[in-house]
Amino acid sequence: HWLTYRDRGTLEELWPMVRDATDFVLALQQPRGEIIWARHADSTPFTFALLTGSSSICHSLRCAIAVARELGHERPNWELGAARLDRVIREDPDAFAPKHRWAMDWYYPVLCGVIRGETGRERLDHRSEAFTIDGWGIRCVSDRPWITAAETCECAIAHLAVGDRAGALRLFGWAQRLRDPNERYWTGIVVPEEVNFPGGEQ
């Protein structure tokens, strides 16, 4: 919103929420740098961190830091937390619950800007065969024939983030097969049967 409209009033209005949410999240950061996935209803933390979630958090922390700087608030602990999280995502995959079958763990570190440039392109290339069905898109899970619009389009953005425009356009083009006549996207499809999954969900 800020980058598009330069609406400082909205930025100031949202600041207390951004501040409190960021502090809440960083309270779940572990000594290695990973951030625990959630808290239970009684406020005790879960026992594991997720790579996809932590990648998204890393991007959100950078945005929160940018908001703080724009409003003149110093938050060195946020910058330290973001740096620690960035490092553990890039260097210590064992810090996260094993979710290797899921496509989001494959491309989210690239999508969220943690793994960039040639290293990011290599990461996308490395497991592309496991998750890509030519002409359709990206499997949600590597050993299941479920193609989803969300994973396909997110992975397209990840390709764009590392300069692979051709790969991004190819994936986005495939995703159009999941659009209905009203221009809405089906959540996913099972191939080769071409059955929408979950049934009827858009």
Feature map (PLM): residue ranges:
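Aromatic-rich carbohydrate-recognition surfaces in CAZymes
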Residues: 1-30, 54, 168, 172, ...
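Extended ligand-binding clefts on enzyme/binding-domain cores
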Residues: 12-62, 67-153
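Specific register positions within alpha-helical solenoid repeats of the TPR/Sel1-like families, i.e.
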Residues: 3-6, 62, 69, 111-114, ...
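CBM-like carbohydrate-recognition segments
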Residues: 115-125, 140-151, 157-202
